């Protein structure tokens, strides 16, 4: 896969879906009698293999709310096969950033979703206004360094809360994204999308913190848990660092959820969840997530 010049090797099979959106034509006497072609968004999904091309795969970590993700210049997305088949989506953008699964036994990176709209200044009735299909094209296999595949041990640190200064997940950390997009339509056809919100979440089953540590840090009961208290009142950066590469920081992270497990095999701690909070005190919104 190649997106706007970034070569992205994939760890699994990828998909490209072309599904036109139609509006049903109905008549009182005859029921649904036809359909009218109204819109098309080309959807592409794939699972990146390597922790590279950070700006291309995770472009909205500190977004401008109301910003257009397709913009005025088309960013091409290509599927390039070793048999010479090439499909090029003319105007593409990331619409679902990959989750991160940080651990030794996990793949490291989840699926990314791209969406394609009609090219700038083009009418859908024009040939190749959304995508092109070619065969017999030259293929060059990408170089993949094992060091860029992020399977390794990770340690975490969260503020000054007791038990959280240095801890690890029992299995793996999962970093997810709450990205909200609003389509921009002209006469029913999607021509762009605008960012309306973004937050980052992180969850794991921690090994080291005690039940008392987790209870004290969670805004659930006690002096800090006054009715109406803001999560940001207990927030601090959550920094997750790999033994060789990869650093993930959930900015101004607040502990939002927690649980405990009881049984003969399980460790006591269940899953805990952090969410980013956005500091706007300077007049500029801080980033929700930082990757390095």
Regions found by a protein language model. Name each.
Residues 1-292:
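Signature of extracytoplasmic/envelope-associated structural regions
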């Amino acid at each position: 896969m190649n997106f706007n010049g970034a070569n992205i090797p994939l760890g699994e099979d990828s998909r490209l879906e072309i599904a036109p959106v139609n509006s049903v034509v109905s008549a009182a006497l005859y029921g649904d009698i036809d359909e009218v072609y109204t819109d098309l968004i080309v959807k592409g999904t794939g699972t990146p293999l390597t922790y590279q091309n950070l700006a291309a795969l995770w472009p909205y970590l500190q977004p401008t709310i109301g910003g257009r993700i397709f913009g005025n210049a088309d960013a091409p997305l290509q599927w390039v096969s070793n048999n010479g088949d090439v499909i090029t989506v003319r105007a593409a953008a990331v619409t679902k950033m990959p989750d991160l699964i940080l651990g030794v036994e996990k793949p490291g990176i989840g699926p990314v979703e791209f969406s394609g709209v009609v090219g700038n200044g083009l009418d859908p009735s024009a040939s190749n206004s959304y995508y092109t299909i070619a065969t017999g094209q030259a293929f060059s296999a990408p170089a993949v360094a094992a060091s860029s595949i992020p399977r390794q041990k990770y340690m975490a640190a969260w503020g000054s809360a007791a038990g959280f200064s240095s801890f690890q997940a029992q299995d793996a950390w999962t970093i997810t994204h709450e990205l909200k997009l609003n389509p921009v339509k002209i006469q029913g056809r999607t021509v762009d999308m605008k960012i309306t919100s973004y937050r980052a979440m992180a969850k794991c089953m921690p090994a080291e913190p005690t039940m008392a540590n987790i209870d004290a840090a969670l805004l659930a009961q006690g002096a800090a848990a006054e009715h109406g208290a803001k999560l940001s009142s207990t927030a601090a950066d959550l920094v997750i660092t790999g033994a060789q590469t990869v650093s993930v920081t959930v900015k101004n992270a607040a502990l939002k959820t927690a649980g405990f497990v009881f049984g003969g095999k399980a460790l006591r701690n269940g899953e805990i969840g952090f969410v980013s909070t956005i500091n706007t005190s300077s007049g500029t919104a801080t980033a929700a997530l930082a990757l390095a």
